[in-house]
Regions:
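Class I S-adenosyl-L-methionine
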Residues: 1-222
Length: 222
């Protein structure tokens, strides 16, 4: 995977122990991403540092998963902490094919990420029903209309909401970490413990994240 780097074990208060995969911002992002030129968190430190380093890196994803298995007790991989699944505004088939093959070869490792270009990914033939059970790619959407379209295509989605008390659809759950922070209390879980975004048992549950003043969360930003 060109323009891609990985950290087999990273740990912070929100995510808990996870492996992170970084891609170059811009060239791997869809031109339709509304945050690309205004507020993309991946252009801010410290994520920007990893994204810049990824420019010169090539990641062997299967070998990376072997390293994750050895070093990461959670065996959870978060894709696209920076960047997306594109190259020059087209679906990066080399990336997707290697990702899917590696996921199938390592069913004990949970892999998840978000894309701002689910329609192009879907049109390219990479639909949710073609992903193995341990791989979840969520549609990152910016409004309820796009969320409805993603759901109609069979995609699990993540969207943002300004108010954690706002009414959500029956198949939506507010991120418990964001909800706790909105109430001014310490979250009682981490992403690694929660698993709402990626565990197979939650495959029909869509996620709502908190709108952040000065810029929206992107892809469930940590």
């Amino acid at each position: 995977m060109k323009g891609t780097s990985g950290t087999p074990l990273s740990d912070n208060r929100k995510t808990g122990p996870m492996a992170n995969v970084y891609r170059t911002v811009g060239v791997t992002c869809p031109s339709t991403c509304p945050l690309l030129e205004r507020g993309c968190y991946a252009k801010r430190w410290p994520v920007a540092l990893h994204a810049k380093r990824a420019q010169e890196k090539t990641l062997d994803f299967n070998a990376f998963l072997q390293e994750v298995r050895k070093k990461n007790p959670s065996k959870i991989v978060r894709l696209n902490v920076s960047g997306d699944v594109f190259v020059n505004d087209e679906v990066d088939r080399e990336f997707m094919d290697e990702l899917i093959a590696a996921a199938k070869a390592n069913p004990d490792i949970l892999i998840y990420g978000y894309t701002h270009g689910f329609e192009k990914v879907h049109a390219a033939g990479y639909t949710p029903d073609t992903f193995p059970a341990n791989l979840t790619l969520l549609a990152s959407v910016d409004d309820k209309d796009t969320a409805a379209k993603a759901a109609a295509y069979g995609w699990k989605y993540a969207r943002v909401e300004r108010d954690y008390t706002a009414k959500t659809d029956e198949d939506e759950v507010f991120c418990p970490i964001d909800a706790a922070k909105s109430k001014g209390i310490e979250p009682k879980t981490t992403c690694a413990e929660c698993k709402l975004c990626f565990a197979e048992k939650y495959k029909n549950v869509n996620i709502v994240f908190q709108y952040v003043t000065g810029g929206r969360k992107k892809k469930g930003g940590a």
